[in-house]
Amino acid sequence: MVNMKASMFLTFAGLVLLFVVCYASESEEKEFPKEMLSSIFAVDNDFKQEERDCAGYMRECKEKLCCNGYVCSSRWKWCVLPAPWRR
């Protein structure tokens, strides 16, 4: 008797494989891996970081001061959220 989890996993893996094969056959003229990776990791200009006078969360705070609501960690020199033991 086949375990239900194993059969669901195989079904899901089969569907994923079918999707990849269908997509590859439709886009033969494209460079498949490069196109797929570029669409997954596409960076929009709206999401790029702006240059600030202060450092945000998990940013280095050696030269810059941390933005409002963050404190500079004395151990790691990153801007972190304030906690009772960091005051």
Swiss-Prot record:
This protein's record includes keyword Electron transport: no
Entry-linked SUPFAM superfamilies: omega toxin-like
Tissue: Expressed by the venom gland.
Propeptide: 25-52
KW Signal (keyword) present: yes
Gene Ontology molecular-function annotations: ion channel inhibitor activity; toxin activity
Signal peptide: 1-24
InterPro entries associated with the record: Huwentoxin-1 (IPR011696), Huwentoxin_CS1 (IPR013140)
Disulfide bridge map: 54-67, 61-72, 66-79
GO cellular component: extracellular region
Function: Ion channel inhibitor.
Stated name of the protein: U3-theraphotoxin-Hhn1m
Species assigned in the record: Cyriopagopus hainanus (Chinese bird spider)
